[in-house]
């Protein structure tokens, strides 16, 4: 039997919230890469030791800021209304996921880029990536019986990498990115039969 995780002390919870609010404010105002952990600690009114013990480094702080946003999208996928949530055909759910994830990606692009590039291969070790991949693989297996759904899920997630989208947005706007990703999703779910 697993024990419940230890409860967070009230002062630790207050400090965590202060740090996250300070980081979100500074990141919005100056961009994630321009803000130091020292600046976050000063803005939050906590010591650097508190910040580093709690989050480790900037990528850990970014991951904490993304956590609630990722959980929200995951909940909408698992139990929200169709077509993103259950109850729609698999192909429609794939298209809805690509649209919802593109919106999420564009809104939190700087945070996602830092999280996904914290170390080589970091994107693929993030629990959220594994969730997105598994979700798409299940839907693609249903939409394209006989196709290599596992690989196709990776292929569909590849152009959704934050670093890639950052580079593409230098050349075109978010609407064009979203339209192109929709075409890719359509091709995967409506393409020729596997074989």
Language-model regions, residue ranges each:
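Amphipathic C-terminal alpha-helical segment
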Residues: 104-107, 111, 138, 142, ...
């Amino acid at each position: 039997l697993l024990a419940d995780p230890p409860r967070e002390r009230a002062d630790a919870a207050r400090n965590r919230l202060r740090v996250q609010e300070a980081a979100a404010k500074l990141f919005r105002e100056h961009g994630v890469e321009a803000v130091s952990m020292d600046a976050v600690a000063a803005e939050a009114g906590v010591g650097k030791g508190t910040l580093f013990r709690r989050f480790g480094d900037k990528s850990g702080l970014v991951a904490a800021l993304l956590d609630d946003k990722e959980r929200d999208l995951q909940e909408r996928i698992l139990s929200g209304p169709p077509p993103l949530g259950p109850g729609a055909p698999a192909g429609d759910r794939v298209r809805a996921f690509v649209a919802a994830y593109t919106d999420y990606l564009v809104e939190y692009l700087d945070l996602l880029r830092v999280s996904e590039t914290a170390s080589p291969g970091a994107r693929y070790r993030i629990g959220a990536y594994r969730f997105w991949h598994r979700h798409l693989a299940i839907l693609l297996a249903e939409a394209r019986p006989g196709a290599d759904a596992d690989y196709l899920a990776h292929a569909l997630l590849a152009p959704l990498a934050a670093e890639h989208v950052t580079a593409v947005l230098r050349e075109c706007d978010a609407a064009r990115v979203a339209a192109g990703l929709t075409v890719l999703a359509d091709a995967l779910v409506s393409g020729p039969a596997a074989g």
